């Protein structure tokens, strides 16, 4: 009887092990994008490790770039195997999928955009230092809001 009880307890304990392992994400920077106004187009997440090209030249100067399809007005970017360091992130909702942040004739963005630390620039994009954050090599979960 004791052996049977021990067997059942062991089965119950180990039955949950694969589920708990599946829930733990690989170490990296995991970003949930908020305030996406629609599911049209894609979201581009650009991770920069230096001020060079931040944030305008995200396709050419970013350390890592992810382009994610939007589902039900939600998107998530997961950057894994990222070395320790200081980073800044820029996110663009590319509604027409032309690979750039569209603007009106005054230069004001007509598509959604956002920066880490919810950084804002005075008359343009924020500086790298305003948007930068330290990354220690462990799991980092962030949320970023888009502005239209």
Positions of the model-derived regions?
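Bacterial N-terminal signal peptides
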Residues: 7-16
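A short tyrosine-centered beta-strand micro-motif
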Residues: 85-91
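Short, flexible loop/turn segments at beta-strand junctions in immunoglobulin-like
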Residues: 79-82
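Sec/Tat signal peptide C-region and signal peptidase I cleavage site
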Residues: 17-24
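Acidic, glycine-anchored loop motifs typical of Ca2+
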Residues: 95-101
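Short strand-edge motifs at loop-to-beta-strand transitions and within beta-strands
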Residues: 73-77, 129-131, 140-142
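A short, amphipathic beta-strand motif
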Residues: 29-36
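Beta-strand signatures of extracellular beta-sandwich domains
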Residues: 44-48, 90
């Amino acid at each position: 009887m004791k052996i049977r009880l021990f067997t059942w307890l062991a089965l119950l304990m180990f039955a949950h092990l694969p589920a708990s392992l599946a829930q733990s994400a690989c170490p990296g920077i995991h970003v949930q994008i908020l305030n996406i106004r629609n599911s049209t187009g894609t979201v581009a997440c650009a991770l920069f490790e230096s001020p060079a090209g931040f944030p305008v030249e995200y396709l050419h100067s970013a350390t890592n770039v992810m382009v994610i399809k939007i589902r039900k007005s939600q998107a998530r970017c997961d950057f894994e195997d990222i070395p320790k360091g200081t980073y800044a992130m820029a996110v663009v909702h590319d509604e027409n999928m032309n690979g750039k942040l569209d603007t009106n004739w005054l230069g004001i963005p007509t598509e959604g955009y956002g920066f880490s630390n919810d950084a804002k620039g005075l008359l343009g994009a924020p500086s790298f230092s305003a948007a930068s954050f330290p990354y220690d090599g462990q799991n980092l979960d962030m949320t970023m809001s888009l502005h239209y």
